[in-house]
């Protein structure tokens, strides 16, 4: 089966079409802007899969309708998913703009005095606004000389932010969300909303009963040689934690081996269902070998599966990590309890950063006073105002232990193409696999247990659906916190100590939901959240605006908020603008 090509970035150099001196004097400068933009993007960006980003430049500068149409024909044949229009001069606004209604688009108007690039930028954006096709504005803060071919830092930041978000939009379009099972324990996020995926993300939902997973395991619809490799890898790398079950519920060695085997098989079969596996065709399973073209998935698990079969914790944790028995590779996006809305937040974070995502319960707010009462310890530093306990039995990527290191030796989570095998091994070494608690998981299983290193910047996100409004996005930038071991142990043993933990301290602003840490917890819209490495809330905001998803809560500095220029016409408060603009334009793929 032919591999689906990755979306490309289209670069549209536009120019003043007047011949006999004007156009001729601008051709080289205009095309050089396009080439410089393409060079920047190809150097600084990668797709989430790790592949290099490709740019497609119009064959000629665009002065009017004919050249715009020729450019569009080229872009259509090359899978261009977003466009950047560049110019150093006046051009003919509505005659030269990109009119595709769903493709993210930006315009960079050169800030120079010789020719009025800013005037074209304003005219073109006015046309976009009038026609209901929002576009992003890029205009340098400082005047440049006409022969200056450099890209200023503020322009570069906007070009890269737009491109990261635009690539995420283009990469999700046409893919599917694999809903493996149904609603888990009444969790609203697992009431999978097909209209949301279709209208806002351009995706389909593939609904598959969990009996399909059972069928694949029982009928050996998998690569048996790979299973043996996975078992050998687990035997070498898995460290097992204590079994906290009562004696009558503890499994013997043979039973535990069967649980491990099935857990690894679940990982293999869910992966094969998502992306396909050509080796299944070799054993006569051609239909199953194709997969479901899923860029994200969710597994219901509880309780209809987990009351009799091993839970999804091991499978989910390994799939969401950047490595397994096949080595370092791109992490998958698999939401525990089939929480599709948390899965979408995971998908956004992965597409923007190329990193694994940490799925967690937003479990407990610990005030400084409560911690001091329980442990005698007084919080300080990043934790001085209190912390949130992020913990879940399921799909927290092992990368979340933060045993990888950045260029300065700090703990982090890297894009998978930067992770060494030694760093993957360190994450595995920092993880214990604890037998699942019988009261929760009667069919057994293994839960990963690790503790996230402290001082690491994270962005916590969540998508919620509000009746009458549609989807909204929540964002909270902050840091992981490291507590003294005895303090962590006391707090952790008050909940389920066999699960992975991140102690999270959001950055406070003193206003609204970020007045204090309690307010962050109180305003969080659901029981789950996602941790993405770094303070990348601004990228989430830009991506959300492209999809027409308003942001209902964030602590990103106002100077970093970057949305289409038409948002400014929807009022004077930037967050109110966001709601009104998203309502006005409606979902990106209106249905």
Curated annotation (Swiss-Prot):
Alphabetic keyword roster: Carbohydrate metabolism, Cytoplasm, Fucose metabolism, Isomerase, Manganese, Metal-binding
Gene Ontology cellular component annotations, sorted alphabetically: cytoplasm
Keyword Isomerase carried by entry: yes
Pathway: Carbohydrate degradation; L-fucose degradation; L-lactaldehyde and glycerone phosphate from L-fucose: step 1/3
Localization terms from the record: Cytoplasm
EC number: 5.3.1.25
Quaternary context: Homohexamer.
Its job: Converts the aldose L-fucose into the corresponding ketose L-fuculose.
Protein name: L-fucose isomerase
Organism: Escherichia coli O127:H6 (strain E2348/69 / EPEC)
């Amino acid at each position: 089966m032919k591999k689906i090509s990755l979306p490309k970035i289209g670069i549209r150099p536009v120019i003043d079409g007047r011949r006999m001196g004007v156009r001729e004097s601008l051709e080289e400068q205009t095309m050089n802007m396009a080439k410089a933009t393409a060079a920047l993007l190809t150097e600084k960006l990668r797709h989430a899969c790790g592949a290099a980003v490709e740019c497609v430049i119009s064959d000629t500068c665009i002065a009017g309708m004919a050249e715009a149409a020729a450019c569009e024909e080229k872009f259509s044949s090359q899978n261009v998913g977003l466009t950047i229009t560049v110019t150093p001069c006046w051009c003919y606004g509505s005659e030269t703009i990109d009119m595709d209604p769903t493709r993210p688009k930006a315009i960079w108007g050169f800030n120079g005095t010789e020719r009025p690039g800013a005037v074209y930028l304003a005219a073109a954006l006015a046309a976009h606004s009038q026609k209901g096709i929002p576009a992003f504005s890029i205009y340098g803060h400082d005047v440049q000389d006409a022969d200056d071919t450099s890209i200023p830092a503020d322009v570069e930041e906007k070009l890269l932010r737009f491109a990261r978000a635009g690539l995420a939009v283009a990469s999700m379009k046409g893919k599917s969300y694999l809903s493996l099972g149904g609603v888990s324990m009444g969790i609203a996020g697992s009431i999978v909303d097909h209209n949301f995926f279709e209208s806002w993300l351009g995706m389909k939902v593939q609904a598959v009963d969990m009996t399909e997973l059972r069928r694949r395991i029982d009928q050996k619809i998998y690569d048996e040689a790979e299973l043996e490799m996975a078992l050998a890898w687990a035997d070498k790398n898995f460290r097992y934690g204590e079994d906290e079950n009562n004696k009558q519920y503890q499994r013997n060695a043979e039973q535990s081996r069967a649980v491990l085997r099935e857990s690894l098989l679940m990982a293999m079969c869910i992966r094969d269902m998502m992306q396909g596996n050509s080796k299944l065709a070799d054993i006569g399973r051609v239909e199953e070998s194709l997969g479901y073209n899923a860029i994200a998935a969710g597994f219901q698990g509880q309780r209809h599966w987990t009351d009799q079969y091993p839970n999804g914790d091991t499978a989910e944790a390994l799939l969401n990590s950047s490595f397994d028995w096949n080595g370092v590779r791109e992490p998958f996006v698999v939401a525990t309890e089939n929480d599709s809305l948390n899965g979408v937040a995971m998908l956004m974070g992965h597409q923007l950063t190329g990193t694994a995502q940490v799925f967690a319960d937003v479990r407990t707010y610990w005030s400084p006073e409560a911690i001091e009462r329980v442990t005698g310890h007084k919080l300080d530093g990043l934790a001085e105002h209190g912390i949130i306990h992020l913990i879940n039995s399921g799909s927290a990527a092992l990368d979340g232990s933060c045993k990888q290191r950045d260029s300065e030796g700090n703990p982090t989570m890297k894009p998978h193409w930067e992770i060494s095998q030694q760093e993957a091994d360190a994450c595995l070494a920092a993880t214990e696999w604890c037998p699942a608690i019988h009261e929760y998981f009667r069919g057994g299983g293994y839960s990963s247990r690790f503790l996230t290193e402290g001082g690491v910047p994270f962005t916590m996100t969540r998508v919620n659906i509000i009746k009458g409004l549609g989807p909204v996005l929540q964002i909270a930038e902050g840091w992981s916190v490291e507590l003294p071991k005895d303090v962590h142990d006391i707090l952790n043993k008050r909940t389920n100590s066999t699960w992975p933990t991140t102690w999270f301290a959001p950055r406070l602003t003193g206003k609204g939901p970020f007045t204090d840490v309690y307010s962050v917890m109180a305003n969080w819209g659901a029981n789950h959240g996602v941790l993405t490495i770094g303070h990348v809330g601004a990228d989430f905001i830009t991506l959300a605006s492209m999809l027409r998803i308003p942001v209902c809560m964030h602590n990103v500095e106002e100077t970093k908020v970057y949305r289409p220029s038409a948002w400014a016409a929807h009022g004077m408060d930037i967050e109110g603008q966001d709601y009104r603009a998203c309502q006005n334009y409606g979902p990106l793929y209106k249905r």
